[in-house]
């Protein structure tokens, strides 16, 4: 193969890669299809109060009524290894991009729609200062139910122990099986002590929220 042919081959290959990536990004989720694919999900997220045990004991997150774009981004991060968690990586790697889009669409509309007041419960001053320090409301919204971007998560009413382990995971960079490598959140979480992260998690978890853990049966 001569130089011209090699360059042409490389160019065409790059076009195919870009096209495939664009198609994956542009997938439309089908909630009805997602309902048929959620058997693995309900084994943990369909049991109210279900607890994970790695890297410590905590309740698995509520995902019903969560933003579809956030669920999609989270699953892709587990699949790529950006988020390090053995169980979730195994689950995510078994899913195609279409599966991820469908499941995300399903859980966004799953559960009962709840109307939450725009104004949040005023935090204690020490917590307010911590939230201001990180600019948390700037991305996650003033009431922590209406993020500025749909790829950001709703936080209000999420399990406190999950929020705490999630925040800690952004500080954990040296562990091969635990941690999250998101540059923005890692930078935000780094300046806080663990005690301060706990205060933030406890406050956010105490807020009225739209997120739900809805009991689901594997038997349909």
Where are these regions (language model features)?
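Bacterial N-terminal signal peptides
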Residues: 9-19
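Intrinsic, low-complexity N-terminal interaction/targeting segments
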Residues: 39-42, 102, 118-119, 168, ...
């Amino acid at each position: 193969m001569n130089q011209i042919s090699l360059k042409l081959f490389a160019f065409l290959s790059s076009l195919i890669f870009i096209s495939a990536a664009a198609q994956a990004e542009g997938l439309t989720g089908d909630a009805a299809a997602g309902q048929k694919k959620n058997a693995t999900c309900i084994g943990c997220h369909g049991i109210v109060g279900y607890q994970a045990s790695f890297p410590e004991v905590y309740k698995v997150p509520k995902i019903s009524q969560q933003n579809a774009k956030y669920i999609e981004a989270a699953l892709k991060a587990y699949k790529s290894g950006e988020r390090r968690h053995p169980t979730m990586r195994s689950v995510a790697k078994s899913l195609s991009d279409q599966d991820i889009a469908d499941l995300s669409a399903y859980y966004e509309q799953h559960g009962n729609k709840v109307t939450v007041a725009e104004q949040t419960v005023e935090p204690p001053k020490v917590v307010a200062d911590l939230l201001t320090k990180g600019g948390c409301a700037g991305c996650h919204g003033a009431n922590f139910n209406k993020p500025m971007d749909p790829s950001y998560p709703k936080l209000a009413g999420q399990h406190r122990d999950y929020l705490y382990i999630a925040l800690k995971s952004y500080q954990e960079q040296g562990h091969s099986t635990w941690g999250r490598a998101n540059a923005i959140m890692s930078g935000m979480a780094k300046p806080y002590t663990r005690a301060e992260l706990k205060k933030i998690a406890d406050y956010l978890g105490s807020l009225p929220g739209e997120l739900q853990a809805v009991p689901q049966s594997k038997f349909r």
